[in-house]
Amino acid sequence: MKNTKCLIVLFFFFLMPFCYSQTDSITNNKRDILDVLYKLFHKNDSVRTGMDKKIAFSLLPVPINADKSGGLVVSFLTSFYLGDEKTTNMSQITFSPYFSFTNQYVFPIQTYIYTKDNHWNFIGDYRFMIYPQDTYGLGGNNTADEMSTLDYQQWRFYQFATRKIVGNYRAGLGLLYDNYQNISEESFIDGETDYYKYMNGDFSNETSFGVAFQGLYDSRENNVNPEQGMYIEADYRINTSGVEGKKWNSIYIDARKYHSFSKQRHKVLAYRAFYWSTFGGKPHYLDLPSIGWDRDGKTGRGFTRNRFRSNALLYFEGEYRMDISKNGFWGAVFFTNISSVSKFDTYDFSKWNPAVGTGLRIKFNKKNNSNLVLDYGISKNDWSLRLGLSENF
């Protein structure tokens, strides 16, 4: 019953009047970082060429203090078209290795591929992580007093393939594989931690493998920095294993809508609703829904990643994006989000956690409309600072 209520909330969240949409076009008077670099190394009257190519690259090596752990992130993003731009959506591949001073090493590759005329869509998530992270217990009432550090290594291989049915509607299957190794925990509390109690003191390696049925609707023209359209993804996962051999299932719904308010300037209102729950068995502790651990890792600006964890997560976010300069080089965003994890082993969302924040945008590559993204979010007793080359959603 609780699952049904959450789905109804997500449905009505997107039944709002549409503003007119704006195509993700690039005008001649737009400027980006590559234009600035080109001017520095070429004659003043020279004009940057090569803008008609179907492929665009962005590379960003930057030291960053993200979620209170300093480190270095190197973000590489490439976008391209596998067919006519009028009939084929943009594809992208992102590689963002991250190294922190708290001994976190993350090597993620994410792909979002459209074949010619959008006949097929392939979504991939592949990563290797050595990832000691703070964990705060299970359920909505967890506090820093319950914190411990969970250290582990993870291999992930997620691959979805969907086929065009009609228009922007698609359906397909996915294979999802996670392997957790060398798990250990350093506790800062007296007594047993939630991890220890949930896993019955088991720190052995664990493998999760599942098959997912995916329904997808995507009317965006640019998935790096959308200005119009809608994205709705619904996954139903059937996992073949679980803790104590108890197989489990999950529902994963991600819905996003974009409204443009100007044909000349970048003025976009974007909002998102996200629901993730597990049921029917016992997933590994690290497979449970957690803030910041959606597939893109971008929920929960204003919170430390992994701050809240339970068997169900509900999340809403809104953001206003705007140009500051007329040539689109400088921009800004203002965002707010609110989330809740259920009381553990129920679907009761009684405690909500709000956050607000703002961000700076610098046009990195006008070919794919990518920005240098710097976002600062704040919430009660927590904050986050995030950097990247694509919008948060």
Predicted regions and their residues:
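Transmembrane beta-strand segments of outer-membrane beta-barrel domains in Gram-negative
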Residues: D24-S46, I55-S58, D125-R127, Q133-K263, ...
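Outer-membrane beta-barrel initiation region
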Residues: Q22-I123, K197-E227, I324-W330, V341-S342, ...
